[in-house]
């Protein structure tokens, strides 16, 4: 085989190797993004239930204008699903509660997808932690 043919084979192997590495990186980034979106979507649903609790009269099992007394059991019977696990993060105040979703995908060696959602009576704001 001539030198030119060997050089073309080596160049082809390098190009294929780079393409595979880029493809793996893109797949991982997409999986993280999809998990983050799914966790955020679940948190929006839980935030809506928290706001329902806030508005519901105490006689019907609600907070009657306060988040005080809200537990995760009042939001959902399942604290986890295929997207991740969910919890009330920190103390529940009368006018706000923070929900946390921890996803299944690892962002780096030590951290997984994590999203916090601060819920008030009229809004819910998501913050990406990882």
What are these regions (language model features)?
Residues 2-12, 84-91:
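General secondary-structure propensity
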Residues 29, 33, 56-59:
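General structural signal for alpha-helix termini and helix-helix connectors
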């Amino acid at each position: 085989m001539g030198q030119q043919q060997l050089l073309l084979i080596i160049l082809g192997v390098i190009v294929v190797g780079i393409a595979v590495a880029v493809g793996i990186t893109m797949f991982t980034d997409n999986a993280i993004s999809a998990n983050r979106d799914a966790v955020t979507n679940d948190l929006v649903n839980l935030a809506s239930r928290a706001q329902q609790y806030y508005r519901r009269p105490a006689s019907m099992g609600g907070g009657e204008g306060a988040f005080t007394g809200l537990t995760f059991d009042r939001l959902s019977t399942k604290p986890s699903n295929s997207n991740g696990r969910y919890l009330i993060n920190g103390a529940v105040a009368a006018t706000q509660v923070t929900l946390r979703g921890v996803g299944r995908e690892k962002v780096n060696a030590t951290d997984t997808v994590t999203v916090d959602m601060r819920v008030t009576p009229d809004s819910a704001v998501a913050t990406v932690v990882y």
